[in-house]
Amino acid sequence: MSFFVNRVWYGNHFLQWILVPFSWLYRIVIRTRRWYLQRFCQQLYPIPIIVVGNVTVGGVGKTPLVIEIAKKIQQKGLKVGIVSRGYKAAIKHFPYEVKLNDSAELVGDEPLMMARKINCPVVIAPKRNEAVRYLLDKHSVEIIISDDGLQHYKMGRSIEIVVIDGMRKLGNGFCLPAGPLREPDSRLKQVDFVIVNQGAAGGAYSMELIPKNIVRLSTQEEVSKDSFTSEVAAVAGIGNPQRFYSTLSQLGIKFNPYSYPDHHQFKPHDLNDIDLPVIMTEKDAVKCYSFSSDKLYYLPVEAKLNDSFWEAFWSHQQLQGYY
C-alpha cells in the first residue's frame, strides 16, 4: 500500500496511467451513486448538520478541526453533538454513545479522543443517520458535526467543509485506483468551505495545527519539549505520519520514526521493546492508556484558523439565528 501512496498516488509512476481507465469508471459509479442517494435516500433534519470531510484517502487532520468547531459552538452557548462512523470499533450494536472509560478498541480512536477532549455527546454508527437521530432524541442538540461522512449522502447536511493536506494536496489528481481521490476535484467547488491543513491554496482557508506541551501518558503531567535532550522514538499510527514527524523536527526533538498503519491498535509488545522514550500522537495515545508507563508521552495539537474563516462560518445562512 505504501508503494501506491508514495510512488503512484503522490508521484509520477507510469502505473497510474494504466489505472486511469478504471478511475474514469469509478467516477461514473460515484456520480451515479451520489445522484441516486441525494434524490431518493437523503434524510433531512430540522437543525444544522455540519460535515467535516475530505476528498482524498487517508488522514488530513479533520478531527482537530471537528474539536475546534465544537468548542467554538459551545462558546456561543449552543448544545452540540458529534457523530462518527467509529472506524474499526469492536462494538457491534449501534448507535452507541461513547463513554469516557471506553477503550479505543471498543469505540475507535478518534471518537474516544473527541469524547475526552470535548464535553459533548459523541455517538458512533456506520449508518450516520442512526447516530443523528439518537442525538436528537436523547440530547436535544442544536447543531451536529459529522466527523468525516462527506460521501455519506444518505445523511442530509447544511454545511460541507473539506480539509486538504497541505503537504500532499490532491496527489496526482486522479480518482481511485489511479490516484487518492474519493471524488473528483470538481467537488471542491460545491462545498461551503475548503481548508488546507498546514498550507495554502487559492480560495481556501489555512489551518495550522499548533503543538501544545508534551504530556506524560501515565500521569497526564505536562512536560517541556526541552526535557528531551537525547533521541526519542516517534510513534505514529496515522494517515500521514510525516506531518507528525515534521512537527517534532520543528520543535527541535531528535527522533527515530516508527510508523504503523492508520488506526493501528497498539499492544504492549509494540512499544515494550523500544528502549527510548516514546512520543506519539494524541490519537495513538488513547489506545495505550491500559498499558501506559512513564516512558510514554504524547503531543497534543490544536487547530487554529484565522478570523476570516470564523466570520464566514458564522455568517453562513444555515447558522443564522443560532447564536
From Swiss-Prot:
Looking up SUPFAM superfamilies in the UniProt record yields: P-loop containing nucleoside triphosphate hydrolases
Annotated residues that bind ATP are located at 56-63
Query: Record's InterPro entries?
Result: LpxK, P-loop_NTPase
Q: What is its EC number?
A: 2.7.1.130
Q: What top-level class of enzyme does the UniProt entry assign?
A: transferase
Biological process GO terms, please? Answer: lipid A biosynthetic process; lipopolysaccharide core region biosynthetic process
- Pathway where this protein functions: Glycolipid biosynthesis; lipid IV(A) biosynthesis; lipid IV(A) from (3R)-3-hydroxytetradecanoyl-[acyl-carrier-protein] and UDP-N-acetyl-alpha-D-glucosamine: step 6/6
UniProt keyword Magnesium, yes or no: no
Task: Alphabetically list the UniProt keywords.
Answer: ATP-binding, Kinase, Lipid A biosynthesis, Lipid biosynthesis, Lipid metabolism, Nucleotide-binding, Transferase
Q: Which GO terms describe its cellular component?
A: plasma membrane
Q: Which reaction(s) are listed as its catalytic activity?
A: a lipid A disaccharide + ATP = a lipid IVA + ADP + H(+)
Q: Name one GO molecular function term.
A: ATP binding
Role according to the record: Transfers the gamma-phosphate of ATP to the 4'-position of a tetraacyldisaccharide 1-phosphate intermediate (termed DS-1-P) to form tetraacyldisaccharide 1,4'-bis-phosphate (lipid IVA).
The family annotation for this protein states: Belongs to the LpxK family.
NCBIfam families from the UniProt entry: lpxK
Q: Which HAMAP family match?
A: LpxK (MF_00409)
PANTHER family attached here? TETRAACYLDISACCHARIDE 4'-KINASE, TETRAACYLDISACCHARIDE 4'-KINASE, MITOCHONDRIAL-RELATED
Protein's recorded name: Tetraacyldisaccharide 4'-kinase
